[in-house]
């Protein structure tokens, strides 16, 4: 089971679009996917027509008194389940703070292997909730758009991923950056080229074009690939999903030193989780 935090520090970068769209495209490839909506705004929950909740079960999952799997519910997208966002997440971030990291690890470790992928839609900040998601996940994906501000603003996100890897979760890897809402303008092409020049293979090969089908799909409460399956943007999303499948870090060459460090960290986490359960 691959666990992936979809993270950026700002709203409007295509984070929820990437989460919902990739989940649906992965399901078309036969991969059962769970979306964990960790954004208090609940955009992913609203997109799929379920809506965020004011119940506190997700908060309880971080406390260890409820299981994430028990909170999962089916969505309109076949093969895609979701744990709804909750207004209690704001309370969790304020009250639990550092304990959120341990809570996220414990919650993710408790998930059964019922899903092939778990995609965590992070809040549009680099606060405790986002850090907790990075602690609980094996991978991170950074969605962004081909605008100067998005391109220049990606560095703090990459630095946060590196910080969590160094201090808290040595198993964490950057799976890549997904560029969306790519228009036909020279500016968009230049920004994408600059991103590839700076970050090389960390940028996914396929990009997702700008299309009115995306907001239309959100209004309809459906993933783009279900709302407009033959649209060019749906083909883009499927291409990104296929590359995501290929970028499995557990099938890549593992540095022995990093592997030992990650194994030692997991042992410490297991002891901490056991002592607080």
Locate each region found by the language model.
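P-loop NTP-binding core
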Residues: 1-277
């Amino acid at each position: 089971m691959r666990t992936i935090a979809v993270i950026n520090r700002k709203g409007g970068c295509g984070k929820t679009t990437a989460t919902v769209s990739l989940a649906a495209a992965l399901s078309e490839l036969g991969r059962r996917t769970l979306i964990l909506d960790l954004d208090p705004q609940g955009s992913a929950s609203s997109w799929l027509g379920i809506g965020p909740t004011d119940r506190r079960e997700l908060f309880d999952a971080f406390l260890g008194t409820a299981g994430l799997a028990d909170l999962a519910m089916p969505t309109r997208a076949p093969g895609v389940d979701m744990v709804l966002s909750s207004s209690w997440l704001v309370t969790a971030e304020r009250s639990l703070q550092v304990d959120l990291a341990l809570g996220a690890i414990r919650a993710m470790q408790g998930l059964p292997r019922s899903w092939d992928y778990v995609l965590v839609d992070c809040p549009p900040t680099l606060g405790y909730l986002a850090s907790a998601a990075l602690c609980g996940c094996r991978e991170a994906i950074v969605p962004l758009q081909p605008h100067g501000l998005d391109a220049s603003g990606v560095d703090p996100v990459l630095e946060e991923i590196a910080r969590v890897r160094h201090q808290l979760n040595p198993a964490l890897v950057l799976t890549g950056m997904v560029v969306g809402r790519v228009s036909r303008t020279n500016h968009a092409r230049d920004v994408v080229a600059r991103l590839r020049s700076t970050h090389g293979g960390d940028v996914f090969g396929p990009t997702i074009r700008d299309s009115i089908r995306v907001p239309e799909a959100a209004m309809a409460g459906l993933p783009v690939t279900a709302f407009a399956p033959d649209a060019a943007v749906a083909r883009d999303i499927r291409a990104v999903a296929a590359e995501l499948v290929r970028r499995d870090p557990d099938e890549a060459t593992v540095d022995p030193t990093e592997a030992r460090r990650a194994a030692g960290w997991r042992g410490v986490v297991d002891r901490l989780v056991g002592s607080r359960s």
